[in-house]
């Protein structure tokens, strides 16, 4: 049977949703592993990653059930959700790729200010640094963070602040994040196209007089 047929479309849609399920389970597993080993202590970060994993898992399950049973309603819901996810993910990915250094600094500074002391201390220990950025505007907060910091720098003259360390890798990280996001956003468009095509194909094993 050619690849445009019913069986091929069904198998391709099932395979795509199995990949989504594996990615969702991977996100949940990595978040649980990070929390269990104390790599990330913030419940908000852990909860966010797990929520994304569960959401992706649910979408994949809906798509998989819809593909296996050729369920019209489930396939329609699957297409609508994937389109909404694509729009959001495409905008976020493009924003990551377009973000310059001053915008990165503003974003990281805002995020740092909203962090709890526990999360800041955890980051300082992981990155081996103290404080965010030693600038005139943030001098008071920087001194406060340094006073609470437990990391001891072997050479104070060569020590970078956490902001400097994060900004050194932020550009590369954002490009990777944006690129991966764009890749997955186009797989979502592929999923919508496969679901639409499969939804409008007739099951050769079904009653010839039945509607799709």
Swiss-Prot record:
Residue numbers on the Cytoplasmic membrane side: 1-12, 66-72, 197-212
Is Glycoprotein set as a keyword in this record?
yes
Q: Which GO terms describe its cellular component?
A: membrane
Q: Any ranges marked Extracellular in the topology annotation, and which?
A: 34-44, 94-175
Q: Which Pfam families match?
A: Tetraspanin (PF00335)
**TM regions (residue ranges):** 13-33, 45-65, 73-93, 176-196
This protein's source sits in the domain of life called: Eukaryota
Which keywords does the record carry?
Glycoprotein, Membrane, Transmembrane, Transmembrane helix
Is Transmembrane helix found in the keyword set?
A: yes
Primary localization class, coarse = membrane
Localization, UniProt: Membrane
The family line of this record is: Belongs to the tetraspanin (TM4SF) family.
- Protein name per Swiss-Prot or TrEMBL: Tetraspanin-31-A
Instruction: Give the source species.
Output: Xenopus laevis (African clawed frog)
């Amino acid at each position: 049977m050619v690849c445009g047929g019913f069986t091929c479309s069904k198998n391709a849609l099932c395979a795509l949703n199995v990949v989504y399920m594996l990615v969702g389970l991977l996100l949940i597993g990595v978040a649980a592993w990070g929390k269990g080993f104390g790599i990330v202590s913030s419940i908000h970060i852990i909860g966010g990653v797990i929520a994304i994993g569960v959401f992706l898992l649910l979408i994949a399950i809906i798509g998989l059930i819809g593909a296996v049973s050729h369920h019209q309603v489930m396939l329609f819901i699957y297409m609508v959700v994937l389109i909404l996810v694509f729009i959001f993910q495409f905008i976020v990915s493009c924003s990551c790729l377009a973000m310059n250094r001053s915008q990165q600094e503003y974003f990281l500074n805002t995020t740092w200010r909203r962090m709890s002391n526990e999360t800041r201390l955890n980051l300082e220990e992981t990155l081996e640094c103290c404080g965010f950025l030693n600038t005139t505007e943030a001098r008071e907060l920087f001194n406060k963070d340094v006073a609470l910091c437990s990391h001891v720098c072997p050479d104070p003259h060569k020590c970078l602040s956490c902001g400097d360390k994060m900004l050194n890798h932020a550009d590369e990280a954002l490009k990777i994040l944006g690129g991966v996001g764009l890749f997955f956003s186009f797989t979502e468009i592929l999923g919508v196209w496969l679901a639409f095509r499969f939804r409008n194909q007739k099951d050769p094993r079904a009653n010839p007089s039945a509607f799709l």
